[in-house]
Amino acid sequence: AHILQKAEELHRLMGESPYEFIRTGETSFAPLWNRPVRGRDTFYRFYTYHDLHLLCCRLKDIYDTYDCMEDAMAAAGPCEDPILRLQQLFADLNGIPVLHGTSACKRLAMFLRWMVRTDGIVDLGIWRTAVHPRQLIIPLDTHVHQISLRLGLTGQKPATLRTAREITDALAKVFPDDPCLGDFAL
């Protein structure tokens, strides 16, 4: 319920078009940092309004150069590692994991899945050219990890990006064009 309240708050701040809100620039971001702060500056969980402001600024920089995120993803040529490309676009922002750490990069993998896959139910499939579904990494959470260990899809005990890649490789043997299709089965 709290995430829905935050989504409604963003809708009130950004209006009908978050894209246009971002494109209009710094002055439109004022509500994100000129708001009265009661206690902490927390927007959601560990993410602050300042973090949200920095994300909007980064998106504006991207949209000043490219028409859309997909174009930014495709700009460097064929995308071998979409998680790395996405991480590079948003490097140094709070909430964006570094790839040499212990993170499984679940949120990045989930975002990419939503943008690339088209299932008509959960995944939006907005991006058609920058990334192919076979390049996606399964969004690894504790449940998928535990089931994958039991099924022998991975032998990795920690839930890291390496583990997510190992599970994805195992699923690619069954679903070579779309390994994340196995996410729903797990």
Please provide the spans of the model-predicted regions.
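HhH-family (HhH-GPD) DNA N-glycosylase catalytic core used in base-excision repair
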Residues: 1-186
